[in-house]
Amino acid sequence: KSFPKFNKNDFGLKKIESEIWNGFIFIRLNKGPQKSVKSLMSPFSEELGSYKIENMVPTDGIWTQKTEVNWKSVRDVDNEGYHVPMAHPSLQDLYGKNYFDEPFVNGTSKTHASFSGKTARNWSVKNYKKLSTPAAHLPDKYKNSWNYFGIFPNAVIAVTPETVQFYQEFPISTKLTLLRGGIYRHKNETRQQRIARYLSNRIDNHTVAEDVQLTIWSNESMNSKSFEGFYLSDLEYGVKSHHDHMRKQIPILKIEKQPDEHLIYKINKEML
């Protein structure tokens, strides 16, 4: 009552763009040229729709972790899987050679990994394979695999027979990155599914720790005074396709010699 008459709508919260897709809520603070998430992810709509993600519920909320590397080091490691046999013994035990990366095309990518038929040596993997119990609504072709769907530039949605999760990374500075994610389970989860989820989480935790170490080594190598650039092998097409997407959006990345910092915005704008 102490305020004079005025239009409250003029002083309300600012509107932002939002979209609900398969239960996930996406927001955009500023308008941009990107497609809707539904359109962007349309190549995988049938597959991801089979998991009924919108009916799943959170497990332990959102987790966060900071790592002292450039965010692009995190993304480069995550965008190729040929390091799995040497760097991730649990994943190698889970699916072995049954692992295939698809490159980024029009803003999305996919990695498919089906369980191997071999007896696992790792305790968590061995018991996970034994107890994995897919939901009744999941088609047979998705019941024995883990699949990862990349969304350019910095997000991944991963599905297993028991869970769906997202993870992403945000640059805090050129030397510090925030990792963030969440895991969701079936609403009417059985005891066996809960145990399988616990085991898959153990496998994931080991993998995350191993990947963090790889990003540290990668970041250290590029900060070395001896670093003079690199060549990508044919096995690193996932990394290359992500770099190609980056260069398209930020063309100044094509320049080999770093320009003066105060000129970066101007040069990049001229190259668009």
Question: Model segments located where?
Answer:
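Short Fe-S-cluster ligation motifs
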Residues: 1-27
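C-terminal catalytic domain of Rieske-type non-heme iron oxygenases
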Residues: 19-272
